[in-house]
Amino acid sequence: MKSFKYKNLIVLCSIFIISSCSSMDGLRFWKSDEIDPDEPKELVAFSNQKNIVIEWKNSFKGENEIGNFLPDFSAQNLFFSDASGNVSSINASTGDRNWSIELNFLASGTSAGFGLVVVSDIDGNVIAVDQNDGSKLWSTNVKGEVLSKVAIDAKVVVVKTGSGELLGLDRENGEILWSYRSKLPLLTVRGSSSPVIVDDLVYVSFDNGRLG
């Protein structure tokens, strides 16, 4: 008799478990073949839309295939450079070109601020020109390829080379004021992260994974 009761109890428990699982779709371990999990969801329609008005546009003949030549903004002007050595100043309001110069082939650019526009050429020269007319102010060879934008403040221009060296150049004449060299790992890819100056402190990430 006890055996019969136990069998009935087991059957009832089994029925309860099966019925519970069938009503809980989220706990099912199988899915219908009609549902494709990789199918993208339907896009939501947005009613709050605005049209973009183009105030002006300009074009440049140089290329920027690896993204090392982002423009910069300073004193109501935009500054551009490219790998061919073209450096230009554009009025941000009108799109009119203020000036254009040609330098040696460049490795990176463009940083602007405190009256300077700074780029770096393929021979390791950091070149500063005047924001107002593009005249060359100074050039300093840092003995290493510079693939990242420099950082500029009122006193110093901070440069990071591909060999892991960080240098501070005098903003007025380009003289090397100080330098710091990080230890590169045995296997590394040429780094291109840019230094940042905040409250007289320089922040930079090195190829060995350290943040200084």
Which ranges hold each PLM region?
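Beta-propeller domains
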Residues: 82-93
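Short loop/turn segments that connect beta-strands within beta-propeller blades
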Residues: 91-94, 130-133, 170-173
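C-terminal motif of bacterial Sec signal peptides marking the signal peptidase cleavage site
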Residues: 18-20
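Structural signature of WD-repeat beta-propellers
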Residues: 82-83, 121-122, 161-162, 206-207
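Bacterial N-terminal signal peptides that target proteins for export
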Residues: 2-10
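Extracytoplasmic beta-rich repeat domains
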Residues: 24-27, 34-40, 47-72, 97-114, ...
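Conserved beta-propeller blade signature
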Residues: 77-79, 117-118, 157-158, 202-203
